[in-house]
Regions:
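Nucleotidyltransferase catalytic core that binds NTPs
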Residues: 1-123
Length: 123
């Protein structure tokens, strides 16, 4: 599994199935999301997990989380700090610029309680 810690510019990926959230612990719901993106590998897509770095409230260490996600079939783990750019980005811009633009998402799946975008309780 490739691990990308974003501190500036996002990587340019293509043809990706993406799930996103904090993933501070890997519970049954998280596993189902990973299963959905992993299923897209049969279509030639990479399974990408976009995680907001919530290190102060993590249940697992970064290494534990990465190890579990790799075993579950994630190809790329993208970890990003919740910075002002993301925090103040409208949902539509986040989808266009980051998910579809930078991460090359052709498929996105999130949990039913996931919220993102300015004034929408991002992650």
């Amino acid at each position: 599994m490739e691990y990308l810690k974003i501190e500036g510019e996002f990587p340019k990926l293509a043809n990706c199935a993406v799930t996103m959230g904090k993933f501070d612990g890997i519970h049954r719901g998280h596993r189902k999301l990973v299963e959905k993106i992993r299923e897209r590998k049969t279509l030639g897509e990479q399974a990408v997990l976009f995680a907001i770095d919530a290190s102060s409230n993590m249940i697992l260490t970064r290494q534990e989380r990465a190890s579990i996600l790799e075993k579950l079939g994630v190809d790329v783990l993208v970890e990003c700090q919740l910075n002002d750019r993301i925090r103040h980005m409208k949902a539509e811009n986040f989808i266009k610029e980051i998910l579809m633009g930078d991460l090359g998402a052709s498929y996105v799946v999130v949990g039913e309680d996931n919220r993102f975008g300015f004034e929408s309780n991002l992650f």
